[in-house]
């Protein structure tokens, strides 16, 4: 279960692990937020985190290559609360 998962890596100062590829978009889970995105042509993907209404991201988390299956990237970022950030992706 997602609530029993532990971090396996640190990306951009955040504890992370491969996400649940079946949860599309940003999904709050116990302990953090799962981010999953599908892109046919992307060769890499970076998660951008913003403070609410900010124009410049406060964090950039590049998805490790091992967090990609086919054309889908998924990463669980621990310690995030959905009310504290906005997000985007960079390809």
Residue spans for each PLM region:
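Short beta-strand segments enriched for Tyr within beta-sheet-rich domains
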Residues: 37, 83-91
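Aromatic-rich carbohydrate-binding modules that target alpha-glucans
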Residues: 8, 16-20, 26-27, 40-83
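Structural beta-strand segments of beta-rich domains
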Residues: 31-35
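A eukaryote-biased signal for short, well-structured alpha-helical docking elements
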Residues: 1-9
């Amino acid at each position: 279960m997602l609530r029993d998962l532990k971090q396996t890596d640190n990306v951009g100062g955040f504890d992370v692990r491969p996400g649940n590829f079946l949860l599309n978009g940003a999904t709050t889970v116990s302990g953090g937020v799962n981010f999953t995105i599908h892109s046919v042509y992307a060769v890499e993907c970076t998660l951008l985190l913003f403070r609410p209404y900010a124009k410049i991201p406060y964090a950039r988390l590049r998805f490790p290559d091992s967090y990609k299956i086919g054309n889908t990237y998924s990463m669980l970022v621990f310690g995030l609360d959905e009310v504290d950030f906005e997000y985007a992706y960079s390809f």
